[in-house]
Design a protein with these regions (language model features):
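Enriched for short, Lys/Arg-rich terminal
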Residues: 65-128
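Residue-level detector of alpha-helical recognition elements and their boundaries
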Residues: 25-30, 41, 45, 91-92
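A short, surface-exposed loop/turn module that caps and links secondary-structure elements
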Residues: 38-67
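Short, well-structured alpha-helical interface segments that form or flank functional binding sites
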Residues: 6, 21, 25-28, 62, ...
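Generic preference for hydrophobic/aromatic residues in regular secondary structure cores
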Residues: 3-5, 48-57, 75, 92
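Generic secondary-structure microfeatures
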Residues: 30, 34, 38-41, 69-71, ...
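Arg/Lys-rich, positively charged N-terminal/basic patches that mediate binding to nucleic acids
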Residues: 1-37, 117-128
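Charged, low-complexity, helix/coiled-coil-prone segments
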Residues: 13-17, 49-53, 108-113
Length: 128
């Protein structure tokens, strides 16, 4: 299955805060995770976490994850399988400091799921 990566304006603005060298390292690490996703999704998910238990209407599952890039950086993204076009779509929403990941995650979740959420409950997730 092909993987399509999309990024939001917020993600692009977050990246601008980094030097070119740091950006290169971030993108390189992200690409290694994308490759891992296409080979073995379970291994990919070991490097990511859902920071909030989000129950959606109609038995939909939340697709938001916090991906550990390094000790201090997380990328907030969604991973959606598109069976019609036989691809996985990754949307990059934010690149934030680890300490700000929960806040960014919640903000993205509230924006994406405002009309679909039936119950929100924050959960404690160990750092991945």
């Amino acid at each position: 299955m092909d993987v399509l990566i999309e990024s939001t304006r917020d993600f692009e603005q977050d990246l601008e805060q980094f030097s070119n060298t740091e950006k290169f390292k971030i993108i390189k690490k992200l690409n290694s995770y994308v490759e891992l996703l296409s080979i073995d999704k379970n291994l990919f998910y070991k490097h990511s976490a859902q920071l909030r238990n989000i129950r959606l209407k109609e038995n939909y599952d939340s697709s938001i994850y916090s991906l550990r890039i390094n000790e201090n950086l997380r990328i907030i993204l969604t991973i959606d399988d598109d069976p019609i076009f036989e691809r996985t779509v990754i949307t990059l929403f934010r690149a934030v400091k680890a300490k700000d990941a929960a806040k960014a995650y919640n903000s993205v979740a509230e924006t994406l799921y405002q009309d679909f959420t039936i119950e929100n409950q924050e959960i404690e997730v160990p750092t991945c």
